[in-house]
UniProtKB/Swiss-Prot annotation:
Designated name of the protein: V-type proton ATPase subunit G 3
Similarity-based family: Belongs to the V-ATPase G subunit family.
Species, as recorded: Xenopus tropicalis
Biased composition (Polar residues): 1-12
Pfam families according to UniProt: V-ATPase_G (PF03179)
Length: 118
């Protein structure tokens, strides 16, 4: 019986060693998974920062060019207003005189299609 007891003890010890090895393997696996997850998260964060930087750089270049366009449009608008203003002052007297001549110098005439009937 002692040999059976000794055999059972050996089996129990072997079972315990196997259980310990399994637990240690699970711990190593969990540790590797955690480490892989942390590395993936770090890579994702790094990629996100890179893409956000690219986006900001492109956005700045586009918005900057739009700002330049706004300045150019403003300059062109001012130039056009000055041109129209100078044209107005240049031709104002002549146009006013033509309008007054048309209003005051009336020449009554019969229409060419008018037929006088008696």
């Amino acid at each position: 019986m002692a040999s059976q007891s000794q055999g059972i003890q050996q089996l129990l010890q072997a079972e315990k060693r196997a259980k310990d090895k399994l637990e240690e393997a699970k711990k190593r696996k969990n540790k590797r998974l955690r480490q892989a997850k942390e590395e993936a998260t770090a890579d994702i964060d790094q990629y996100r920062l890179k893409r956000e930087g690219d986006f900001r750089r492109i956005q700045t270049s586009v918005m900057g060019s739009q700002g330049n366009l706004a300045v150019k449009i403003e300059e062109q608008t001012v130039e056009k207003i000055q041109l129209y203003s100078s044209s107005f002052h240049k031709y104002k007297e002549g146009v006013l005189q033509q309008l007054l001549d048309l209003a005051y110098n009336i020449k009554p005439e019969l229409h060419t299609n008018f037929q006088y009937k008696l």
